[in-house]
Curated annotation (Swiss-Prot):
Basic residues compositional bias, start-end: 1-27
Biological role: Binds directly to 16S ribosomal RNA.
UniProt family annotation: Belongs to the bacterial ribosomal protein bS20 family.
Protein's recorded name: Small ribosomal subunit protein bS20
InterPro entries, per database record: Ribosomal_bS20 (IPR002583), Ribosomal_bS20_sf (IPR036510)
Annotated organism of origin: Aliivibrio fischeri (strain MJ11)
Record bears the keyword Hydrolase: no
GO molecular function terms noted in the UniProt entry: small ribosomal subunit rRNA binding; structural constituent of ribosome
Gene that encodes it: rpsT
Gene3D superfamilies in the cross-refs: Ribosomal protein S20
GO cellular component assignments: cytosol; small ribosomal subunit
PANTHER family associated with the record: 30S RIBOSOMAL PROTEIN S20, SMALL RIBOSOMAL SUBUNIT PROTEIN BS20C
Keywords recorded for this protein, A-Z: Ribonucleoprotein, Ribosomal protein, RNA-binding, rRNA-binding
Gene Ontology biological process terms from the UniProt entry: translation
Region described as Disordered: 1-28
């Protein structure tokens, strides 16, 4: 448990950030799942539309530091390749 005033403040800030990041991470995963579902269904138009909404979101999460930029690039590349293969 934090003893000093500054440590207590940092603990509350960390908890606030953790909850905010969890919400963002959940949103990102939801959009990724929508893209995956469209790809598995074989619907190229829906998959392309889902990827168009997921791509800027992945880029934003990478910019904010929620995920690594290489992870965002890897997901985008794999989704794009899967859609082209449909």
């Amino acid at each position: 448990m934090a003893n000093s005033k500054s440590a207590k403040k940092r603990a509350t800030q960390a908890e606030r950030r953790r909850q905010h990041n969890a919400s963002r991470r959940s949103m990102m995963r939801t959009y990724m799942k929508k893209t995956i579902a469209a790809i598995e269904a074989g619907d190229k138009e829906a998959a392309t539309a889902a990827l168009a909404t997921a791509t800027p979101l992945l880029d934003r999460m990478a910019t904010k530091g929620l995920i690594h930029k290489n992870k965002a690039a890897r997901h985008k590349a794999r989704f794009t390749a899967a859609i082209k293969a449909l």
